[in-house]
């Protein structure tokens, strides 16, 4: 943990033709979460990630969701990954490796992470339904690809059930 007034936090703004994104993250926060992307299930995913990680997370995205959610989800994920990398800084005092197996209702997920500085993703899941509400589930892997690329982490995710 940082000493004194040092905080592991970052603010990233990303603007493209299709979207405008603001991500603020404080790894030493208290679990305050505010996520608004215009894509409800993606908001839920990011909110749960922040909540269960115990950090503060603010995400404000406006995008061309009237066309589809691809650009909004991609640009937000890239900005989140960059903010995570910046907040981790030199990673002093942080264990390099971590893993968990978590049941989420009907879903069982196993994840392992390496804060190596080298982006790499393995994402395995069984056949999925195309939509959860209005969310295009084919974007799931792309979310993680985008986060991994900017966070510069190695991540293995296996959806074992559900």
Predicted regions and their residues:
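Structural preference for solvent-exposed beta-strand-turn elements
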Residues: 5-162
């Amino acid at each position: 943990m940082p000493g004194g007034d040092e905080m592991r936090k970052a603010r990233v703004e990303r603007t493209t033709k299709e979207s405008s994104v603001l991500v603020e993250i404080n790894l030493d926060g208290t679990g305050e979460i505010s996520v608004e992307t215009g894509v409800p299930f993606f908001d839920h995913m990011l909110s749960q990630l922040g909540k269960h990680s115990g950090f503060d997370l603010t995400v404000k995205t406006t995008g061309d969701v009237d066309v589809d959610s691809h650009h909004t989800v991609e640009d937000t994920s890239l900005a989140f990954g960059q903010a995570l990398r910046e907040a981790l800084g030199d990673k002093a005092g942080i264990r390099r490796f971590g893993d968990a197996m978590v049941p989420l209702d009907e879903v069982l997920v196993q994840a392992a992470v390496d804060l190596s500085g080298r982006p790499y993703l393995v994402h395995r899941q069984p056949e999925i339904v195309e939509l959860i509400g209005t969310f295009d589930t084919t974007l799931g892997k792309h979310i993680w690809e985008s986060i991994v690329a900017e966070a510069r982490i190695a991540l293995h995710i296996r959806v074992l059930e559900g």
